[in-house]
Amino acid sequence: MFKAKTEIIERLAGKYPKRIEELEKIFDGKTNIYIDFANVRPWSNKLGWHVDPKRLKQFLDSFDNIGKVNFYYGTLEKDRVSEQFAKEIRGYKYELVTKPVKIMSLSIDVSSIPSDSPDIIKNFVRGPLLKKFKVETIEYLNNELLELNKQGIKYIEDMKCNFDVEIGRDMLIDYERNSVETFVLWSGDSDFADPVAQLLKDKKKVILFATARRVAKELNGLQKDGLVIFDIQKIRDFVCWKKELKN
């Protein structure tokens, strides 16, 4: 049953009643939500608007059969903005699942390799694509890296913090121990294909909230087995930043 948690949600529900009806059918039985925020946040580049965690939680809380809403987010240690964001997520009453972001140093030092060597570039370009490069392309890229080296830049930092193991584990635990009937995953990552396939095989309802062209083919292929993909464009005004509301 739907009961708006805020006046804005109530107004929007009156404006888009069919969206609410559709979601009431989706959130069928005991429902848990799993939000892979590192996957969700970049969607704004394509969507042209942002998912607001506070408004999203208020919207989800308006459906009384939604139980746990897990929010997976990597925290940058000793980073004030990152730690404050995690604090806010807890304040919104999400079940926050977090761990430190790993920061990896990747060498871009080409000063001791031949100009036509792919030894450094191969760490950033996948093999099948690298094989398509002409020697001139490799030489050009190495020359660009050498210019950075001359400026004293010998490595770059890359951040990594995946939650595919934790999310897959939590979904299966909720199935085995907590009698969850409907599993709603906010992600389009191929890493979730196996746990989703298992849940579908066990006759559970799985809904993928994502956006067009951000769903891996492995997940798209599970639609024939019952996976439902819901385009979050349909609920833009319910979950976007307030300043991005259409009206």
Kindly label every feature range from the protein language model.
Residues 98, 103-247:
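Nuclease catalytic cores that cleave nucleic-acid phosphodiester bonds
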Residues 2-140, 152, 156, 200-214:
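Domain-level signal for Mg2+-assisted phosphodiester chemistry and nucleotide/NA-binding surfaces
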